[in-house]
Amino acid sequence: MIIKTKYHGEIRIDEGQIISFENGLPGFNDETQFVVLPLSEDSPFLALQSVKQEHIAFIVASPFIFFKGYEFDIDHATLELLHIEDIEDVEVMAILTLEEPFENTTANLKAPIIVNKKEMKAKQIILHDASYETKHLIGGGSC
């Protein structure tokens, strides 16, 4: 299928690449289908692109690249909703807020996106750990 994207123009994707968010993302409840696209070949940054709306795309990255001590438990309800049976099937992404200069870019560690790569289902969860905030400098590297 061909989709229009914010950062890559018009591209062809395989329907198997589509990640389903049953309830959408907070603030974007109607957007339930996304695809993850690399921003460039060697970059850790990805675009979480809506399949329906070309202007809706979030820059995301694995939080573990920038925050080595980042850890949390996934609640039972989320494990069930996403049909997660094996931790190896889980991918975690953090939404980034890009800033100028780039070293002021932040990651939302309070609300990671949990993806079941096997089932292609995802959910953004809200952590209740007070040490995680919505804006952690990615250049800082610690939690």
UniProtKB/Swiss-Prot annotation:
It is found in: Cytoplasm. The keyword Cytoplasm applies. GO terms for cellular component: cytoplasm. It comes from the Bacteria. One of its GO terms (biological process) is bacterial-type flagellum assembly. Signal peptide: none annotated. Keywords: Bacterial flagellum biogenesis, Chaperone, Cytoplasm, Translation regulation. Acts as an anti-CsrA protein, binds CsrA and prevents it from repressing translation of its target genes, one of which is flagellin. Binds to flagellin and participates in the assembly of the flagellum. HAMAP family: FliW. Belongs to the FliW family. Interacts with translational regulator CsrA and flagellin(s). PANTHER family: FLAGELLAR ASSEMBLY FACTOR FLIW. This is Flagellar assembly factor FliW. It comes from Bacillus velezensis (strain DSM 23117 / BGSC 10A6 / LMG 26770 / FZB42) (Bacillus amyloliquefaciens subsp. plantarum). The lineage of its organism: Bacteria, Bacillati, Bacillota, Bacilli, Bacillales. The gene is fliW.
